[in-house]
Regions:
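Sequence-structural signature of mature extracellular/luminal beta-sheet repeat domains
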Residues: 2-14, 24-232
Length: 232
């Protein structure tokens, strides 16, 4: 290739690249980690300061979900599963390649996900109004879809105790509109339940919240923290 031809080709490629600054910015944003903790985050209670991880960064793994929810990590497979509620699907991110693919579609407008003590996937499904478990062979077992003969609202989020019991919130967001499920009448109050998967025994552990949502146990499991997203 002559020097003049080479220069023209190079200049053309550079011009084409320069004409797409949006793609460049998006790629740079995806690759550039953000220092953690973000200086824009204000700590109100000084007791929280000890939980900061100073020598860490935040990296964007995926852009393209309408509403990403319920991430759950599978360390044995080196992948992350999460729900994309309005798109009615679950996605999987692979650590080795960074590739994101569809894990389950339709997902019954899945929301929260967790792993039980045996490592199986537990999922709160809005549209089917149930709590399910994905078995090792990929089949799905319905753990609970009714309480006292009435349909659950739309299970939202969950946590698993070391005794194997499954605690989940049922605020009903998935039946309030057709955006994250399908609109339907409420048959039960917005409760938080404890399910023993071995005996199928169910207990209402909280019935005085407007919209119980995310929940987690304290490290010693003597307390459970529940977010009431219905409180202004």
């Amino acid at each position: 290739m002559e020097r003049r031809t080479f220069m023209n080709v190079t200049a053309g490629a550079a011009t084409a690249f320069a004409l797409n600054p949006l793609a460049l910015a998006q790629e740079q944003a995806r690759k550039t980690p953000v220092l953690y903790p973000d200086p824009a985050v204000e700590i109100i209670d000084p007791r929280f300061a000890k939980y900061k991880v100073g020598n860490a960064a935040v990296e964007r793994l995926y852009t393209g979900a309408r509403w990403a929810e319920g991430p759950v990590w599978f360390g044995d497979g080196r992948f992350l599963l999460f729900s994309d509620i309005p798109n009615n699907r679950m996605l999987r991110w692979l650590e080795d390649t960074g590739e994101v693919s569809v894990f389950r579609s339709p997902s019954n407008y899945s929301n929260g996900n967790y792993r039980d003590r045996q490592g199986r996937l537990l999922t709160c499904e809005h549209d089917s109004r149930r709590l399910t478990r994905t078995e090792y062979d990929g089949t799905i077992t319905v753990l609970m879809d009714r309480f006292q003969g009435k349909k659950l609202n739309a299970p939202n989020d969950l946590a698993v105790h070391s005794d194997g019991s499954i605690w989940f919130s049922d605020p009903g967001y998935g039946i309030m509109s057709n955006y994250e499920g399908h609109k339907a009448p409420f048959e039960l109050p917005a409760n938080v339940y404890r399910l023993d998967p071995n005996t199928a025994a169910v207990t209402v552990v909280a019935d005085d919240m407007d919209k119980p949502n995310g929940l987690c146990f304290s490290p010693d499991e003597k307390k459970i923290y529940i977010v009431d997203s219905g409180v202004p």
